[in-house]
Amino acid sequence: EISACLVGSEMCIRDSLLSVRATVGMVFQNPDNQIVANVVEDDVAFAPENLGVPPQEIRARVNAALKQVGMYDFRLHAPHLLSGGQKQRVAIAGVIAMRPKCIVLDEPTAMLDPSGRREVIDTATKLCREQGITVVLITHHMEECIGADRVIVLSNGAVVADGAPKQVFSQVDLLKKEGLTAPVTVRLLHALREHGMDVPIDALTVSDCADAVAAALKR
């Protein structure tokens, strides 16, 4: 049983768990399991209300959070009328309104189409890069991790790979062993290398991959 945990540089004990929970927000795989209100802005207000935030500040937080995820114009809409990607962005807004230091996204795109997946990943990236919020993304879609600062591969609770995306995704055989598929760019470069073409295997983006192949063809 864990009786204490480390959050940032501070040691927290069981009696201070409430304050710890306020620093971490969670976004679930299915937004329908997280959305509780009949109006978008009411749903986003739910978490800060439970944290005892004053009403005037709640209003400011709700508006700011919805603008951050691009859903402010839908603030008076019914959540059940939104697309999957829009619902997930509302769920993220609800977490942002808590003003957490860290957001954990648990397979947030598993139930979304490609367009919805892109919406969610772009939102998460923006929160990290522009707002300075730590984002922990749990996913089986390796393409979603290309822009990450750090990638950790887990197998049965143990860390089997840990490093920058280029370092981790270049280990194609390891990923395959763990039931994961490397980004399509890496798979293409890996196949070309196996057929004798001298190309790097760590060009993750489509443009970098195209440049690497073009350079190899000129040699």
What are these regions (language model features)?
Residues 103-106:
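Catalytic Walker B motif of ABC-type/P-loop ATPase nucleotide-binding domains
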Residues 99:
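Conserved catalytic motifs of ABC-family nucleotide-binding domains
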Residues 162-163:
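ABC ATPase "signature
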Residues 78-82, 86:
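Conserved ABC ATPase signature
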Residues 1-8, 13:
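Single conserved hydrophobic/aromatic residue that forms the stacking wall/gate
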Residues 56-74:
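Conserved ABC ATPase "signature" region
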